[in-house]
Amino acid sequence: MKTIEVDDQIYRYIASRTLHIGESASDILRRLLALPLDTEPTVALGHEANAEQTDEVSTDVLTMLLDNAQLAKEESAIARFMLILSALYRSQPDAFRHAADIKGRKRIYFAEDPQALLDNGKTTKPKPVPETPYWVITNTNTGRKRLIIEQLMQAMGYSADLIAEVCNKV
């Protein structure tokens, strides 16, 4: 296996073409370029192997996000918050769906339509999370945004170290 460097736009394009968790960049490119499949199967073999593979892939997606120049150049905490939420969804859509049930004392954080968020508070300023079916409240301070990310990642099963690293990027 060789390593190549690609710019952020190309990386995002490749990542956005992922069909399933565990699909490698090589598999995606082979599919996009209509090249023959690799002789080694890349399909998940079982539940245990699949869980390990999911952790590895989702950690890779987040690690790439943390190193991403786009995240670093974003001046707004809301923009960084949205990039992180989008990456979390792309890394584990099913886990994100289950974890999106988290809520604060007085309001829900995520919904599939903005009205549900507005029904829980007229000042929530719901915004769509890019590349997901979800909306999130944005009228919160940076500390609350970090708490939302932390609770979401805990519910998704991420390690405490990775959670802390991601939260520090908001």
UniProtKB/Swiss-Prot annotation:
One of its GO terms (cellular component) is cytoplasm. It comes from the Bacteria. Gene3D superfamilies: Met repressor-like, Replication modulator SeqA, C-terminal DNA-binding domain. Keywords: Cytoplasm, DNA replication inhibitor, DNA-binding. GO terms for molecular function: DNA binding. It is found in: Cytoplasm. It holds the Pfam family SeqA_N. Residues 139-145 are annotated as: Interaction with DNA. Its main location: cytoplasm. GO terms for biological process: negative regulation of DNA-templated DNA replication initiation; regulation of DNA-templated transcription. Homodimer. Polymerizes to form helical filaments. Belongs to the SeqA family. HAMAP family: SeqA. Negative regulator of replication initiation, which contributes to regulation of DNA replication and ensures that replication initiation occurs exactly once per chromosome per cell cycle. Binds to pairs of hemimethylated GATC sequences in the oriC region, thus preventing assembly of replication proteins and re-initiation at newly replicated origins. Repression is relieved when the region becomes fully methylated. This is Negative modulator of initiation of replication. The lineage of its organism: Bacteria, Pseudomonadati, Pseudomonadota, Gammaproteobacteria, Aeromonadales. The gene is seqA.
